[in-house]
Amino acid sequence: MCIRDSQLSGMYQNWFLDYASYVILERAVPHIMDGLKPVQRRILHSMRRMEDGRYNKVANIVGHTMQFHPHGDASIGDALVQLGQKDLLIDCQGNWGNILTGDSAAAPRYIEARLSKFALDVVFNPKTTEWKLSYDGRNKEPVTLPVKFPLLLAQGVEGIAVGLSSKILPHNFNELCDASVKYLHNEEFKLYPDFQTGGNIDVSKYNDGERGGAVRVRAKIAKVDNKTLVIREI
């Protein structure tokens, strides 16, 4: 038996920082380079490896992604449905739920998906991708994907980590394209959030999206009975 003396002072702080860093980097917050959380990146990478032009069962995609994502099938399935509902990177088939009504998607064995043409053209390039070993060392996965489009702004994101949170509102696809062209030409541009579900927004205190900025969104909520609230506009 080996007995070792250790200093307790500072140990909990180091443990907390290690855990916080792991949650931030591996679970909750997207990478600014491609706008994707690790589970989203691994889903897209798996779908690219499976790509043959045909739809795949979501259950099959989830199982394939588990080669790279060690946190269970439920988190993968939920993330895949959220990606599909944004109607940008994934071509969906079947009942994928409805973001307007809040209806959930059908079970993974009943719905299918494949990468959209936009994703195939914009997201992947093996020659410029930096790779790392997967969690068990059996496969390689991308550190980030070489996305040629500001996905972080297009999709928006909400993530809560240990001691850190991120919330970026979604933006309009066409406005992002126009802003990207102006940026490349070194021209001035204004860019504000947009919502798929519609509604009115006050951006007078947006602060160009920097910390401390705020937006005000009008919502119409009706009380039907003691158990039901209907959101008519947001």
Question: What are these model-derived regions, one by one?
Answer:
Residues 4-212:
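Catalytic phosphate-handling regions of large nucleic-acid enzymes and associated NTPases
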